[in-house]
From Swiss-Prot:
The keyword Zinc applies. It is found in: Cytoplasm. Binds 1 zinc ion per subunit. GO terms for biological process: proteolysis. This is Mlc titration factor A. InterPro entries: MetalloPept_cat_dom_sf, MtfA_enterob, MtfA_fam, MtfA_N. Keywords: Aminopeptidase, Cytoplasm, Hydrolase, Metal-binding, Metalloprotease, Protease, Zinc. Interacts with Mlc. Its cofactor is Zn(2+). Belongs to the MtfA family. The gene is mtfA.
Length: 265
C-alpha cells in the first residue's frame, strides 16, 4: 500500500472517525448492516489513498471527511476501491466556484468565458467539489454531486474522455448506447413539453451521453424509484454495471410502500 507523506498514523485516524454518525443520512440508511460495514472498510482505504484538500477557508472535520469518503465509495461498493485509482486528491471549495471555460462552436471558433461550476473531474486529475452541494447530496432526492463526479471517473476508465459508456463487455456496448440515447431523447421530450425546471429528471442529462450517465447514476443511487420504472432496460444495465440494486433496498425498507421491484440479471 502506498504511504502518502501527509497521512501520519492514518489507520488510527480512520478508526477514530465517527462512522456511525456519518452513515446516518437518508442516502445510506437502506444499506444492510453488512453493506454498511463493507462501505466503511472501503471508505477507510479511500482516506488512506486520497488527500482531501479544503480550499478558500473551508474547514474539514472528522464527520465531513467520513461522509465524503462514504459517498465516494458507494458507487464502487461491489466494483472495488481500485476503480477509484484515477486520482489522488479531492479539492473542496465551500461553495460553487468560478472557472475559465474554453469551448469550440459548430464553425470552429474558440470561445472563452467564466462559468460557475459545482464540480469537475479530469482523466488522471483531481476531483473538485464544493461543500454546499455535497451537503445537498446526503438525501434521497436524485441529486448527488459526489456520485456524479465519480461516475465521470468510472466512465473515463473506458478511454481518454467520458463517453457515457463505462467499462463494460464489448458485446453490450451497442445496446447500452441505444438505451442511453433513448433515455436522453425521452428526457428531452419532457423538457420540450414542460420546460427544464419542471422536468422530473435533471435536464442536464439530455445535453450529452457522458452527462446522461453521470446524472442517471445520481438517480440510480438516490432516487431509484424515479429511474427504474421510467427506463427499465437502462436500469438493468446500470444494475449489471454497478452490481447493485438500490431499488431492492427501498423495497426491503419497511418504511417504504408501493416500491416497484427490480432484479439484477
Amino acid at each position: 500500500m502506498i504511504k502518502w507523506p501527509w497521512k501520519v498514523h492514518e489507520t488510527d485516524q480512520n478508526a477514530a472517525l465517527p462512522w456511525d454518525d456519518a452513515l446516518a443520512i437518508p442516502l445510506l440508511v437502506n444499506l444492510t448492516a453488512q453493506e454498511q460495514a463493507r462501505l466503511i472498510a472501503l471508505a477507510e482505504r479511500f482516506l488512506q489513498q486520497k488527500r482531501l484538500v479544503a480550499l478558500q477557508g473551508f474547514e474539514l472535520d472528522a464527520l465531513k471527511s467520513a461522509r465524503i469518503a462514504l459517498l465516494f465509495c458507494l458507487p464502487v461498493l461491489e466494483l472495488g476501491i481500485e476503480w477509484l485509482d484515477g486520482f489522488h486528491e479531492v479539492l473542496i471549495y465551500p461553495v460553487p466556484f468560478v472557472v475559465d471555460d474554453e469551448w469550440e462552436d459548430d464553425i470552429g471558433l474558440v470561445h472563452n468565458q467564466r462559468v460557475v461550476q459545482s464540480g469537475q473531474s479530469w482523466q488522471q486529475g483531481p476531483i473538485i467539489l464544493n461543500w454546499l452541494d455535497i451537503q445537498d447530496s446526503f438525501d434521497a432526492s436524485g441529486f448527488n454531486l459526489i456520485i456524479h463526479e465519480v461516475a465521470h471517473k468510472l466512465d473515463m476508465r473506458n478511454g481518454d474522455r467520458a463517453s457515457g459508456i463505462p467499462l463494460i463487455p464489448l458485446r453490450e456496448v451497442a445496446s447500452w448506447e441505444h438505451d442511453l440515447h433513448a433515455a436522453m431523447n425521452n428526457i428531452q421530450d419532457e423538457i420540450d413539453l414542460v420546460g427544464e425546471t419542471a422536468s422530473s429528471i435533471d435536464a442536464y442529462a439530455a445535453t450529452d451521453p457522458a452527462e446522461c450517465f453521470a446524472v442517471l447514476s445520481e438517480y440510480f443511487f438516490s432516487a431509484p424509484e424515479l429511474f427504474a420504472p421510467r427506463f427499465p432496460a437502462l436500469w438493468q444495465r446500470f444494475c449489471q454495471f454497478y452490481r447493485q440494486d438500490p431499488l431492492l433496498r427501498l423495497r426491503d425498507n419497511p418504511e417504504e410502500d408501493n416500491i416497484p421491484t427490480s432484479h439484477v440479471h
